A protein has these predicted regions:
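Auxiliary Fe-S-binding modules of radical SAM enzymes
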Residues: 1-34, 103, 227-352
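Catalytic cores of alpha/beta
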Residues: 149-156, 212-226, 282-293
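Canonical Radical SAM [4Fe-4S] cluster-binding loop centered on the CxxxCxxC motif
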Residues: 53-93
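An N-cap/entry alpha-helix motif that binds or orients negatively charged groups
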Residues: 20-57
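Active-site-proximal loop/turn and secondary-structure-junction residues that shape catalytic pockets
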Residues: 63-65, 116-118, 145-149, 170-172, ...
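Core AdoMet radical
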Residues: 80-96, 102-123, 128-193, 202-209, ...
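Glycine-rich, proline-tolerant flexible connector loops at the mouths of alpha/beta enzymes
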Residues: 60-63, 83, 111-122, 174, ...
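Conserved, mostly hydrophobic/aromatic
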Residues: 18, 45, 73, 112, ...
Length: 352
């Protein structure tokens, strides 16, 4: 045990210094995770985060614009084949009202997230982006609306979108095909990510921790992919089963493994924008604080209208107590301060 721990610590030291390991070395770190090793990685990750970002934590206002989706991902509560999902689609006026409320609360980044819905066509999305940028020129607009053509991504970028989040979900093609039906393509997902980066978006990828059929090897491949792709953002959170999906009976991912991987991601890329996600706060009450203590530096409170928050149910038990809401920025500030960080009102672009 002692020898394995020493080897693992040496790998973490090397990752801290060189920001790169082999897939086999990442796999070793994942297989030998322990409380002691996670604490060791977290201490180094927080030190690196402080070198780049100080104690600043950036806030993003999340606007869940609709839960209608053409896709049928096996893990997702808003999948097309879920008849139990209470569908909604926000109007342009509702979306702009969310942004106005967020701006008044101090948000300078808005994240428009939703299912792949043909009603939110390229033209509609471009119009929304232009409206928000015209009213709030000092704000960043992030989109998280799934897969489009390169031309569509270019049009949204030209309309003023700054960032795009598209979780890759897994860097292993065989694993991807176990999480998604045959109509969905691993190669197309990767094409989208390359196009986004090439166009000039600040690009975010990410994956679920503990998803069905995930192994130490596939996770190691995720870390290597992120090391090589160099995204501006990376969103990871525990897999949480949703009762109306084919994966309802699979166990959830753990907070412990998620925060350990957050630390490794910070060591891989010290300037990464790394959220402590809502899923982490769902799986344990202090999950987001644990994420910040492991190296995260972004939180994404919910600006969606209260009436729809429960409907955007990607997984069961989603935090909808009010504490995760943007309106409770005071509570959030105190929680962030409790772990030695501070929320800042800023666009929160990546520091290069």
């Amino acid at each position: 045990m002692c020898r394995a721990m020493n080897k693992a610590k040496q790998l973490i030291d090397r990752l801290e210094a060189q920001h790169s390991l082999s897939i086999e070395e990442y796999e070793y770190l994942i297989e030998n995770q322990s409380d002691e090793l996670a604490a060791y990685a977290a201490e180094k990750a927080v030190a690196l985060r402080k070198q780049v970002y100080g104690t600043d934590v950036y806030i993003r206002g999340l606007i869940e614009i609709g839960n209608i989706c053409r896709n049928n991902c096996y893990y997702c509560g808003i999948r097309r084949s879920n008849p139990a999902c209470d569908r909604y689609r926000l109007t342009e006026a509702q979306i702009l009202d969310c942004a106005r409320e967020g701006y008044a609360l101090g948000f300078r980044t808005f994240v428009m997230q939703g299912g792949e819905d043909s009603a939110f066509s390229v033209d509609v999305v471009c119009h929304l982006v232009r409206q928000i940028k015209a009213e709030f020129p000092d704000c960043a607009v992030t989109l998280s609306l799934g897969e489009f053509s390169r031309e569509a991504y270019q049009a949204m970028f030209d309309a003023g979108a700054d960032r795009y989040l598209l979780r890759h979900e897994t860097a292993n093609k065989a694993h991807y095909e176990k999480l998604h039906p045959a109509q969905m393509s691993f190669d197309n997902r990767m094409r989208c990510l390359r196009d986004l980066k090439d166009i000039g978006y600040q690009t975010g990828c990410g994956f679920m921790v503990g998803s069905p059929y995930q192994t130490a090897r596939t996770l190691a491949e995720d870390l290597k992919f992120i090391e090589e792709f160099r995204p501006e953002m990376c969103g990871i959170g525990p897999f949480i089963p949703q009762k109306d999906t084919p994966f309802r009976d699979f166990p959830a991912g753990t907070c412990e493994q998620t925060v350990y991987l957050l630390s490794l991601l910070r060591l891989i890329q010290p300037n990464l924008l790394l959220p402590a996600t809502t899923a982490l706060g769902t799986i344990r009450p202090d999950g987001r604080e644990r994420g910040l203590q492991a190296g995260a530096n972004v939180v994404m409170p919910n600006l969606s209208p209260l009436g729809v928050r429960k409907k955007y149910a990607l997984y069961d038990g989603k935090l909808c107590t009010g504490e995760e809401a943007a309106q409770c920025i005071g509570c959030l500030s105190r929680r962030v301060a409790s772990v030695g960080c501070r929320i800042v009102t800023a666009r929160g672009d990546i520091i290069r």
